[in-house]
From Swiss-Prot:
The protein, known as: 1-deoxy-D-xylulose-5-phosphate synthase
Key words, A-Z: Isoprene biosynthesis, Magnesium, Metal-binding, Thiamine biosynthesis, Thiamine pyrophosphate, Transferase
InterPro entries assigned: Dxylulose-5-P_synthase, THDP-binding, Transketo_C/PFOR_II, Transketolase-like_Pyr-bd, Transketolase_C, Transketolase_CS
Highest classification ranks of the organism: Bacteria, Pseudomonadati, Chlamydiota, Chlamydiia, Chlamydiales
GO BP field: 1-deoxy-D-xylulose 5-phosphate biosynthetic process; isopentenyl diphosphate biosynthetic process, methylerythritol 4-phosphate pathway; terpenoid biosynthetic process; thiamine biosynthetic process
Cofactor requirement: Mg(2+); thiamine diphosphate
Length: 644
């Protein structure tokens, strides 16, 4: 990597500092930012390829426009590392990005006035920008939504496009195209025609001409429409994307997204045009790092503690333990062999949910619908209606976007769609927009729905296999953490063929501890610590949140008056809410202590510290248990821990 003796980056404390630089200095700044991003992400992890691809574009935008007076709205927001470096963030906080004490990996209004929204989900930037443009249309404010090409697989983006009006000024859509295949234009005539037709003056003159023609008595509107069609046809000769013109956006481009001089020149020309514009910018993901540029999907996001070897390959320092997504991917592949008609649907999460092997083995039965969660759910419902088994693999945080589809198209029809809900629980480095801690709140209310969560890899595999027999909508939620490879008890697969049965992991006398999914491990650790205080606990895994095992808990509450619920979910609407409904229905009077995610917004952080912040680390829970129940240390029971 290049060594810089005089850092321009260190002199940038706000976007205004950019305006003092020459074009050559802006290019040097881009290389310094690229060097900084690579060197930091090797240590911290984060979104690599997308941030390397948008550096020059971000610099040019901040050079021409004036944030925060002008409004930059980044779709998704994971590609904003350059934006952060140019808008006065603390460089030490950037070097800890996505970790405790560091910057968010997405835009965050808590960090800067230059960040307008908390971000993390795709497809909403255009709607947000249109709202802001409407509210500020009488001011001098420019509104610039910056969208990746993936945003155009979202229905919400097209809903917003359909609402754009021709009289909307200072509204400039930036399409950051790092994936579309644009046919190359051939020949001098084509190049000249393209430069003329896509020049801002051509757009301005054609719009003025159409308005003037429309004022001609009687035939004006017809003549204006004809003029618009001629203009559109001329554009379509050299541009394969005339669709934007149909949505009242004057199309300009494509332009090289790594040519700062060309970008600055174009932005300066279009800045004050009195109609909405879309600028098509072509960039390369992973720009400046060969391995990331060659495989942008693999290097879209990298984990912490990666290192660059002399061979320019990113290698993990240690062999990681299998995670729940790893187990999911492997098990689904096995089920694909057992069930020759099994289909798998995902909304652009094939790599994250470890479905690449299934995709390669059964390509005709694997469907990636793009960032279109609602369609993924309803499409899966259509497959299920045709008596074909289907798994819809989706992140918990993205399932929110398809709530109506889950109700209307799956549960109301009682179709056996199996939802593999990935990233259930805290998202750690990804932060508040990605925490999977709300899905139980709405899934519990869905008619016909089965909901469960495994405590170990063994139970996970057995639940997935059993779900093919349930013949009802089902949701198996799981976190993105190393999976418990063993299991506290020998599990019989037939136990899960009839959903709704919980399991006793360990018996005691003084208190009942109920742990959901991977929190069973925390429950067993708490049991051991309580034993040192002479307190004996029963530990139970409900496995199924819905249907709830009323019979098992009715028996257990005959012998326990103190209950502890532990779940990595919001305290509103999760396992504890289901348990409280059970208590009210059967009129049990017991003392309940609930550990869950408080009803607040929690940002990013490392696993250990974030668990401490929400009160879900074992030591904090033990202290609170002893205080809450006023337990006093007594002589530990002589009998050893019994496992049944």
């Amino acid at each position: 990597m290049t060594s810089y003796t005089s850092s321009i980056l260190s002199q940038i404390s706000s976007p205004e500092d950019l305006k003092k630089l020459s074009c050559s200095e802006l290019s040097l700044l881009a290389e310094q930012i690229r060097h900084k991003i690579i060197s930091v992400l090797i240590k911290t992890g984060g979104h690599l390829a997308s941030n390397l691809g948008i550096i020059e574009l971000t610099i040019a935008l901040h050079y021409v426009f004036s944030s925060p007076e002008d409004k930059f709205i980044f779709d998704v927001g994971h590609q904003t590392y350059t934006h952060k470096l140019l808008t006065g963030r603390n460089i030490e906080e950037f070097e800890r990005i996505r970790h405790d004490g560091g910057l968010s990996g997405f835009t965050s209004p808590l960090e800067s006035a230059h960040d307008l929204f908390f971000s993390g989900h795709a497809g909403n930037a255009l709607s947000l920008a249109l709202g802001m443009a409407k509210a500020t249309e009488k001011s001098r404010t420019h509104v610039l939504p910056i969208l990746g090409d993936a945003a155009f697989s979202c229905g919400l983006t097209f809903e917003a496009l359909n609402n754009i009006h021709t009289d909307l000024s200072k509204f400039i859509v930036i399409l950051n195209d790092n994936n579309m295949s644009i046919s190359k234009n051939v020949g001098v005539m084509s190049k000249s025609l393209s430069q003329w037709i896509h020049h801002p003056k051509f757009s301005l003159l054609s719009r003025k001409l159409e308005r003037s023609l429309s004022k001609i008595p009687r035939y004006g509107k017809s003549i204006a429409k004809c003029s618009h069609k001629i203009s559109t046809c001329l554009r379509s000769l050299v541009c394969p994307i005339p669709i934007f013109e149909q949505f009242n956006l004057a199309y300009m481009g494509p332009v090289d997204g790594h040519d700062i001089k060309a970008l600055v020149s174009l932005f300066q020309k279009v800045r004050d045009l009195p109609f909405p514009i879309l600028i098509h910018v072509c960039t390369k993901k992973g720009k400046g790092l060969e391995i990331a540029q060659e495989n942008p999907t693999k290097y879209h996001g990298v984990k912490a503690n990666f290192k660059l070897t002399a061979e320019d390959k990113l290698l993990p320092t240690i062999q990681p333990q299998l995670t729940y997504p790893d187990i999911f991917g492997k098990t689904v592949c096995k089920l694909g062999e057992i069930s020759p008609n099994l289909h798998v649907v995902t909304p652009a999460m094939s790599l994250g949910s470890r479905l690449e092997t299934f995709k390669g083995t059964f390509p005709e039965r694997f469907i990636d619908v793009g960032i279109a969660e609602g369609h993924a759910v309803t499409f899966s419902a259509g497959i299920a209606k045709a008596n074909t088994p289907v798994i819809c693999s989706i992140y918990s945080t993205f399932l929110h976007r398809a709530m109506d589809n889950v109700f209307h198209d799956v549960c109301l029809q009682n179709l056996p769609v199996i939802f593999g809900i990935d990233r259930a629980g805290l998202a750690y480095g990804d932060g508040c927009s990605h925490h999977g801690i709300y899905d139980l709140s709405f899934l519990r209310a869905m008619p016909n729905m089965i909901i469960c969560q495994p405590r170990s890899s063994i139970v996970f595999q057995q639940l997935l296999q059993s779900s093919l027999h349930w013949q009802r909508p089902s949701a198996i939620r799981y976190p993105n953490i190393p999976a418990l490879q063993g299991d506290p008890i020998a599990t019989d697969i037939n136990l899960y063929r009839d959903p709704g049965l919980g399991e006793i992991l360990s018996q005691g006398e003084d208190v009942l501890i109920v742990g959901l999914g991977h929190m069973c491990s925390a429950a067993l650790s708490i049991k051991l610590q309580l034993l040192s205080h002479g307190i004996s606990a029963t530990v139970v895994d409900p496995i199924f949140i819905k249907p709830f095992d009323n019979n098992l808990f009715s028996i257990l509450l005959m012998h326990h008056s103190k209950v502890i619920i532990i779940e990595e979910h919001s305290i509103r609407g999760g396992l504890a809410s289901e348990f409280n409904d059970f208590l009210a229905t059967y009129n049990f009077k017991v003392d309940v202590l609930h550990f869950g995610i408080p009803d607040s917004i929690f940002s990013h952080g490392d696993k250990e510290n974030l668990l401490q912040r929400v009160g879900l680390d074992v030591d904090s829970m033990v202290k609170r248990i002893l205080t809450y129940f006023n337990f006093r240390t007594k002589k530990a029971p002589s009998n050893k821990l019994s496992i049944v």
